[in-house]
Amino acid sequence: MASVPTHQSEKEKKNDELSTAILKDKVKPNRLIVDQSEQDDNSVIAVSQAKMDELGLFRGDAVILKGKKRKESVAIIVSDESCPNEKVRMNRVVRNNLRIRLGDVVSITPAPNLSYGTRIHVLPIDDTIEGLTGNLFDVFLKPYFLEAYRPLHKGDIFTVQAAMRTVEFKVVETEPAPACIVSPDTMIHYEGDPIKREEEEESMNDIGYDDLGGVRKQLAQIKEMVELPLRHPQLFKAIGIKPPRGILLFGPPGTGKTLIARAVANETGSFFFLINGPEVMSKMSGESESNLRKAFEECEKNQPAILFIDEIDAIAPKREKTNGEVERRIVSQLLTLMDGVKGRSNLVVIAATNRPNSIDGALRRFGRFDREIDIGIPDAVGRLEILRIHTKNMKLADDVDLEQIANECHGFVGADLASLCSEAALQQIREKMELIDLEDDQIDAEVLNSLAVTMENFRFAQGKSSPSALREAVVETPNTTWSDIGGLQNVKRELQELVQYPVEHPEKYLKFGMQPSRGVLFYGPPGCGKTLLAKAIANECQANFISIKGPELLTMWFGESEANVRDVFDKARAAAPCVLFFDELDSIAKARGGGAGGDGGGASDRVINQVLTEMDGMNAKKNVFIIGATNRPDIIDPAVLRPGRLDQLIYIPLPDEASRHQILKASLRKTPLSKDLDLTFLAKNTVGFSGADLTEICQRACKLAIRESIEKEIRIEKERQDRQARGEELMEDDAVDPVPEITRAHFEEAMKFARRSVTDNDIRKYEMFAQTLQQSRGFGNNFKFPGEQRGSDAPSAPVPAQDDDDLYN
């Protein structure tokens, strides 16, 4: 039987690989890794002789180079014996033209039809010719092109060094287009205004797939849906289906929906038409529909095209819920336009929204927006990819650990990480502000070179940034550890088995073919550390932690309380692995049917129904754990406590003596204490005190010490002033601390105010509940399978620990 889950996991693994198969680079002999060139020539690339033979090329052949974002260039190929077989050497100018960096992959194809040019038009970049006198042609262009036969591609930039200057030129036009070889007979035009550097940099910074991080699976889906039909429509024709028409991207704000659409347009070289939802609306009758029609007509003319509708929920809300006639007409118009897109036309409509459920249902059927792709909150790996993208042009100090930052930024989306990087950089500039004078025309080069963003700057930025998508329910990773909690060893073990094992050892559950338990309920007197335990386990396995206070889910509006529950569970799934902590569970999970009269039409009944269905629907693949805490286990609906939901019921009792000692030590770990203060004696004399009561004693002792310290300082200052008034000589002020530490006297005084928050009567109630639970569990104490006696080598059942701190009683 154990082989079944393994087989299943292999199948799932294969499906995962297939889902991202489109992203894998195909291994071809002409795809080579880019390396730094040893000779700085803009027109020459070098490969090994063996690679030239394999590709059927000869020294001096012209080749076409294909880089990223559909950029192409041309060059002359030569052999270099020191070049490894899988690499190609090229200089920085060629790399920039292809939008690639060292280590990227470039493809090389022969260009036998590349002819000599009749004319070319080149223009200089403005900031490289400032203050230049003399003829550009005679000084720069003529010697450069006479030196060798140079191939050029439209859009290329090349640099020419002469007269102690380096000038950059851009190829505006070539005849024949798009590339040619410049020979002595080629006419060179260089008239016209120089090209502005800003415009050139804008085109250099076109967004491509490289600028997208944390959306690997979604990108694979989009490439299947968009690139395949645009580049190879015959694929769909051969298999006999129509290519998809529309894609709906949805997800929280800032995850990169618009960015993905722009990247796809740039990488496919398609015409890109952007419609912002609200801009379509017009007060003139019929004009809104006309705007939509024009957009579709424009795209039909410029195929292949991508029409991107941002914020589609603004123009296509549910018709039955809108009062405005205009919105209904726009939705109808959009439906007919989507249906009117010709079957084989190279037009794909992409729409984006944060609220997919508010869009008209007719738009979401097959044949319109066929695919809905969730652009969710990135995980740690995705966050690291995004951070690397945003910091690739930043100057980072050696101590910056991007991996650590990525692990700590739970719930951050791409926009939040971009903001984090810019805040860290600004903090670095603030630190250097004393060296910068705003009145100066230029900043000293030494100051500019000393700028480097440090880990300390990132730490500061992390303190100021919070995840935008989860601001309503802050997802945090707590910093509480097991050492902060005194005693409760068995409870800790049980929690580790519940939360840590499924996260850290998922293969064990696969091996035995069983789903891990998903929920636990802590019950016990108030102030015994139920919340603290939940935080510690979330921190221990690096899970997110969403704390939900029961009463905040209930609202006066019909149906909204249930929607709040749904949202909370959706957020937990997005931020998995996640511990969902329901504090005061009894406020939302009371036994149903009791309060029909006065709770707003049974709002709490509906909320508990929603919680139950969400618990049953917890996706097995998502590591979401539910921990509930309550002081009133007797009034909780029994359906919540059945196995499969909150099946582990753990009693958190009042701390025993050893635990009280631990709690006192944890509370006072940062406090200076006098040597004669005996915490063991204090723990012995606080029987029946909860953790919160003990913490209050410590706080009161600290308060008394602070009061005494301030009073003594005031008295010393008064005596000093009196002596000064009498004209006496003042002694040297040694600034002695009047109260250096907390003493026994402070604790003796604090104990006069100490009180027990849990009465004996309360404890009896909890113990009775625990006893009833224990009796209902003992059903199978004497159960044994029939058959032969067990041999000595048979595995024996684990003997339950007979601790006084038993979990369940």
From Swiss-Prot:
Gene3D superfamilies: 1.10.8.60, 2.40.40.20, 3.10.330.10, 6.10.20.150, P-loop containing nucleotide triphosphate hydrolases. InterPro entries: AAA+_ATPase, AAA_ATPase_CDC48, AAA_ATPase_domain, AAA_lid_3, Asp_de-COase-like_dom_sf, ATPase_AAA_core, ATPase_AAA_CS, Cdc48_dom2. ATP 2 binds at G527, C528, G529, K530, T531, L532. GO terms for molecular function: ATP binding; ATP hydrolysis activity; identical protein binding; polyubiquitin modification-dependent protein binding; protein-containing complex binding. GO terms for biological process: autophagosome maturation; embryo development ending in birth or egg hatching; ERAD pathway; mitotic spindle disassembly; positive regulation of mitotic cell cycle, embryonic; positive regulation of proteasomal ubiquitin-dependent protein catabolic process; proteasome-mediated ubiquitin-dependent protein catabolic process; regulation of protein localization to chromatin. The first ATP-binding region has low ATPase activity. The second ATP-binding region is responsible for ATPase activity. ATP binding to the first ATP-binding region induces intrinsic activity of the second ATP-binding region. While ATP binding to the first ATP-binding region appears to prevent ATP hydrolysis by the second ATP-binding region, ADP-binding to first region promotes the coordinate and cooperative ATPase cycle of the second ATP-binding region. Residues 803-809 are annotated as: Interaction with ufd-2. Residues 8-21 have a biased composition (Basic and acidic residues). Keywords: ATP-binding, Chaperone, Cytoplasm, Hydrolase, Nucleotide-binding, Repeat. It catalyses: ATP + H2O = ADP + phosphate + H(+). Coiled coil: none annotated. ATP 1 binds at P253, G254, T255, G256, K257, T258, L259, N354, H390. The keyword Repeat applies. Changing K257T: Loss of ATP binding. Complete loss of catalytic activity. GO terms for cellular component: cytoplasm; cytosol; nucleoplasm; nucleus; perinuclear region of cytoplasm; VCP-NPL4-UFD1 AAA ATPase complex. Changing N354A: Slight reduction in catalytic activity. Slight reduction in catalytic activity. Complete loss of catalytic activity. Expressed in germ cells and spermatheca. Expressed in body wall muscles. Its EC number is 3.6.4.6. Changing K530A: Loss of ATP binding and impaired rotation between the two ATP-binding regions in the hexamer. Complete loss of catalytic activity. Complete loss of catalytic activity without affecting oligomerization. Induction: Induced upon ER stress. Repressed by starvation and oxidative stress. Disruption phenotype: RNAi-mediated knockdown causes partial embryonic lethality. Impairs response to ER stress. Abnormal accumulation of myosin chaperone unc-45 in body wall muscles. RNAi-mediated knockdown in an unc-45 (m94) mutant background, restores motility. Simultaneous RNAi-mediated knockdown of cdc-48.2 in embryos causes embryonic lethality. Defects in oocyte meiosis I progression. Defects in embryo S phase DNA replication causing delays in cell cycle progression. At the end of mitosis, impairs chromatin decondensation and nuclear envelope re-assembly. It holds the Pfam family AAA_lid_3. Homohexamer; oligomerization is ATP-independent. Forms a ring-shaped particle of 18.3 nm diameter, that displays 6-fold radial symmetry. Interacts with cdc-48.2 and thus may form heterohexamers. Forms a complex composed of cdc-48.1, him-6 and crp-1; within the complex, interacts with helicase him-6 and GTPase crp-1. Forms a complex composed of deubiquitinating enzyme atx-3, adapter ubxn-5 and cdc-48.1; within the complex, interacts (via N-terminus) with ubxn-5 and with atx-3. Belongs to the AAA ATPase family. CDC48 subfamily. This is Transitional endoplasmic reticulum ATPase homolog 1. It comes from Caenorhabditis elegans. The gene is cdc-48.1.
